[in-house]
Amino acid sequence: MLRVLLPLLLCGLLPLFATAAELPIPERGPALRIQGSNTIGADLGPALVKGLLLEQGLLKIHSEVSDRDNEQQIVGQTAQGRRVVVDIAAHGSSTGFAALKNASADLAASSRPIKDRELVDLETLGDLKSPNAEQVIAIDGLAIILHPQNPLTQLNTEQLARIFSGEMKTWEELGGTGGPVNLYARDDHSGTYDTFKELVLSPRGKALAGSAKRFESSEQLSDAVSQDRQGIGFIGLPYVRQAKAVAIVDGNSQPMLPLNSLIATEDYPLSRRLYFYLPHNGQNPWADALVTFAQSSKGQAIVAASGFIAQTVQAMNVAPSPQMPDGYRAIIEHAKRLSVNFRFEEGSASLDNKARQDLSRVLDYIKQHDKLNKQVTLVGFGDAKTDSQRAALLSRLRAMAVRRELVKSGVVFREIRGFGAEMPVAANSADEGRIKNRRVEVWVY
């Protein structure tokens, strides 16, 4: 289906691309080299590259599959017949950073944040955590998948850690039937595996069981689980395919399926960001152009068509639930929530890189929908503190930090609220969960 939708989308956007500034075409070799995440490199990366080539007015755009698994070239042709090639190798996120280090890639694709040791390793390329270098191009969710006829409907993150570490060995221990649990996981190079390890295993001091069957390909893993009645695996959202996804609970959160609305706000416990990393001292204008294109409305339309969650801002109705404070219920009765949460750098009141990118998107929405004058409310949340009043104050201060940025562009707010540690979306027992709980929601009337 994706292979049908994407060409139609790209053709539909053709008139919009005619005015793009032309990029230089190298005399020899590829115009751009991208290495890293298989989650990005399988479909999304190639689709974004095709969109950029189309924007450049190239003709006969197509993919050429390499003899090596998970490698391909995206090829186009100028009106004068010159061939333009973009190389994509998708062997896992860590391979992208290694390729930046040895200068065999111009751009790294990653389905997890860059690690501290990689930052140090690549410091000669500049600060890859800076806003210009670290670019969030899409949101994805790790789906926990079962055989489609498995009756289980939800699992919590503690259970997941015990299952994938091999401590819980049978479906009967989970309240089901079927005997031994068969584990399926991505390989060690995969950002998908790194994300699962960081969100589920490492915070609980556990490691993946040696009995797990490992895969470089997301599609092959999903297909294997869907054919194994005793199987369980984790996979990027677009690769659920014929398998069954279950709802996930983290700490005191509500059970959440990997729904678009919950992933867009990053409330879903196993949501994650997908990145391009662009070196500061890179000399390749095609890399700069692809990052800019990916962040544009045209690029985000391709993100959505590829099965990931675009960062396009939308207003959503929210249904009341028993865990909501009265003040929050009063807001949802009359307002709609935007599909963006602002989050912060760890241990800081500074907006993180995605939040900085989202400021302009939220501002565009507010202006386009004529919400500048007292029709926007910011709602802050935080992690649990021993003093609930302090938690409430800190959550309101986070909302004020977002307010300070948006008032510069003329937004007059209706209300700024802070609800402290109410309504957690993640467990407060780990740093990752505390960071997710420190968030600011945007509501419009």
Enumerate the predicted regions with their spans.
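Periplasmic OmpA-like peptidoglycan-binding domain that tethers envelope proteins to the cell wall
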Residues: 381-445
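Sec/Tat signal peptide C-region and signal peptidase I cleavage site
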Residues: 16-20
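Residues at or immediately flanking beta-strands
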Residues: 31-33, 85-87, 373-377, 413-415, ...
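Bacterial N-terminal signal peptides
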Residues: 5-15
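Periplasmic peptidoglycan-binding/anchoring modules of Gram-negative envelope and division proteins
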Residues: 337, 343-379, 400-403, 407-412, ...
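N-terminal secretory signal peptides that target proteins for export/translocation
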Residues: 1-2
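Flexible loop/hinge segments at secondary-structure junctions
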Residues: 21-348, 352-357, 434-436, 444
